[in-house]
Amino acid sequence: MSGVDQIVKKFANLGEGDREAAMKAFLAMMPVSNEPVAEPVRKAPTAKKKVNGFMGFRSNYSPLFSYLPQKMRSPFMTILWQYDPYHNEWDFMCSVYSSIRTDLEEQNVTLQLWIHYAIGQMGLIDRDHYMASFGWRLGQTRNGTTDLFRTAIPMVRRNLQPMNGLCLLIKCLESGLSKHLTNPHPIIAKLQDPSFDMIWINKPPHHQQGHTDQADNSELGMPSLFPGNHAVAAEVDGIANLPLSHRTQQGDFGTEPGFSTQFDTMLDSILENGNHPSNSHYNMSLAMDLPMTG
């Protein structure tokens, strides 16, 4: 019998009082450490995964197929997402949600509830009308299985949408989200911080490219803002050929960059014509970023 077994057997045969005395004797023989006991290190909460557009899309529309098995729902959701024209809008909504997710969850606002209010502000189709609006239907194939069919491809329209995350949040609060939040002010304050907010360009991609081209090429930009016979358009007819800068003598302080006389004259004329009352139609269009006629 080993020494350990003998000790255990002997300890088991001791009376209750003797056992306690034996335990104290064992503890007294153990070495005492003067080193402080390290406190357990608390792990920082793991950052939650950012919600992307498809995750939000699936969360909102997957109940359309709730009566089908999972192996059928997933492919159908992938097909709907593939042909959905609002990927940018979904990415924007979910980016805003991700930036304030912790604050919303603390007040029991789920992703589904956020989307319920956000899609109306983004001009997206609600769940009950989605399939019919985009020409989708479920039907039976020849072998009797259920499949997804598209019978029509409708025109897509986009409404004027919120310009940033704070604007989207405010519109959601106004449309009813506020009744689910006991204190929305910290969330509003967070989105007022540019490091948390994000900007949304509320135009289709081909319109965005058009603005880029106009900004890079003034000869494209002016005809898009004013009719061909307008005084302002005539002023910039040869802007690409003007010398834009020169060096002006500044006495003892050397030279500094400036604009050429030709360019200064042209700019003054543009501003004078542009501020004329007859141009209010164009000034308003510029301010509102709307297409113009005339």
UniProtKB/Swiss-Prot annotation:
Signal peptide location: none
Domain of life: Eukaryota
Residue ranges: DNA binding: 46-101
GO CC field: nucleus
Record GO biological process: positive regulation of mating-type specific transcription, DNA-templated
Compartments, record wording: Nucleus
Record keywords, A-Z: DNA-binding, Nucleus, Transcription, Transcription regulation
One Gene Ontology MF term: DNA binding, bending
Function: Mating type proteins are sequence specific DNA-binding proteins that act as master switches in fungal differentiation by controlling gene expression in a cell type-specific fashion. Transcriptional activator that induces the transcription of alpha-specific genes.
Family: Belongs to the MATALPHA1 family.
Name of the molecule in the record: Mating type protein mtA-1
Species this protein is from: Sordaria equina
